[in-house]
Amino acid sequence: MVHTASGREVRHGLEDDDADTICAMATPSGQGGVAVVRVSGSRALEVAEEVAGPLPAPREAGLRRFRDARGETLDHGLVLVFPGPGSYTGEDVVELQGHGSPAAVTAVLEALCAAGARPAGPGEFSERAFLNGRLDLTQAEAVASLIEAETDGARRAALRALSGAFGQRVDGLADRMIDLRALIEAFLDFPEDEDVPADPPELAAEIEALGSELAEIRRRAAAGVRFGEGIRVALVGPPNAGKSSLLNVLSGEEAAIVSAQAGTTRDVVRQWAALGSRHAELLDTAGLRDAEAQDEIEAEGARRARAAASEADLLLVVIEAGKTLDEELRARIAEQAPRPVVVIVNKIDASGDEAGWEGESEVGAHVRRARVSAHTGAGIEALRRGLAALVDREAGEDAWAARHRHIEALDRAGEELEEALVVARRGGQEELVAEALRRAQTALGEITGRVSHEALLGRIFSGFCIGKE
């Protein structure tokens, strides 16, 4: 028996209290043309009929008046019925589609609760879909990721995970671990049986193959985490090179103060923008120059600029046209490898240089170069296209929407495989190999829900929206 995030007790996907029926608004709150109220549970049909009257045939829309227990009309709209177990939650589901008036929605929800439903908790519809076997945990979380997606890349990554591809890959790897464990344990239990190999065949090679598959899964999941969080893009360079102007141009907002006076930016200024298929946090930093020329506040700003550069997924080094990279900037560029760097030559309107984007730079293979004028806009569109291509290439086209908990579980599985490999190469302690494989398999099971704990489910579903998931 498990106490779920909503506080219910469930066993094998079925509620102990069979009469527990939930309702919630499934569309965003506030005024709108249409609002959808969703009802799910063993009494969903009965409860909905109390409010909407005779229900239409399954999956056929019917126009109905919504009434309270006194018969007063609350609203009118369409009703759709989705019988379980073929519904989203695996239970009987009814949707009432009325007008997007907050007062009308509240009245309908109150009438449904008076008829026997209760308000749904955060993520409870997806939670029930998981408990009833309609979704694994990666798919349930992908629903939330799809709702939260702000870029096309994040949308695509969420749909890949929602299709079940992420969970199927993880479960497939776990099954391979089970098979290898079974082989090892058969050898340990029946060492003299001629039908059982005297030694697990190429045990170390088998574990290495599992590790390679795990690394590929982690790569795609880590890319998906970055889709959800966005990437950090730091703008660094000497004072008065035009970093703040570029941040404002790229973000479309006057987020940073622009002045002809050098050293205007003293702290890190943060602004979000879309770069290609990714959401990016642009970090405008204080100018970097010789320590002797800095006061105490400017020195602290430079320290923060260096910290931002070291943590950036993409580094934009901004210099004035006619100037060269100094020793510190060259060091920063070298330290950034293999993460991408773009050297942006700004203020070409004053130098007469031609605007453009260069695919390569003599500074390093991970470095690109652009020539722009933040003042006139020359070269800015080419810069946007170049940055978008860089960002999309780094993200890849095969990412799955993923969460930090997935990465943590994959890393734990990886540590167990490394331990198993060390023991396997040493030989003679196959039982320790089998135990390490079991722990790795358990870690993978937490990703899809094959292995689930009360605290894990509570943490996952409590972060979802009410009604939408």
Curated annotation (Swiss-Prot):
InterPro entries named among the record's database cross-references: G_TrmE, GTP-bd, GTP-bd_TrmE_N, GTPase_MnmE, MnmE_dom2, MnmE_helical, P-loop_NTPase, Small_GTP-bd
Matching Pfam families: MMR_HSR1 (PF01926), MnmE_helical (PF12631), TrmE_N (PF10396)
EC number, UniProt record: 3.6.-.-
Top-level taxon of the source organism: Bacteria
GO CC terms, sorted: cytoplasm
CDD domains reported for this sequence: trmE, TrmE_N
Binding positions for Mg(2+) per the UniProt entry: S244, T265
Keywords linked to the UniProt accession: Cytoplasm, GTP-binding, Hydrolase, Magnesium, Metal-binding, Nucleotide-binding, Potassium, tRNA processing
A GO BP annotation: tRNA wobble uridine modification
Compartments where found: Cytoplasm
Annotated positions binding GTP: 240-245, 259-265, 284-287
Cofactor: K(+)
Binding site for (6S)-5-formyl-5,6,7,8-tetrahydrofolate: R38, E95, R134, K468
Ranges of residues in domain TrmE-type G: 230-392
Transmembrane segments: none
Subunit structure: Homodimer. Heterotetramer of two MnmE and two MnmG subunits.
Name used for this protein in its record: tRNA modification GTPase MnmE
Species this protein is from: Halorhodospira halophila (strain DSM 244 / SL1)
Gene designation: mnmE
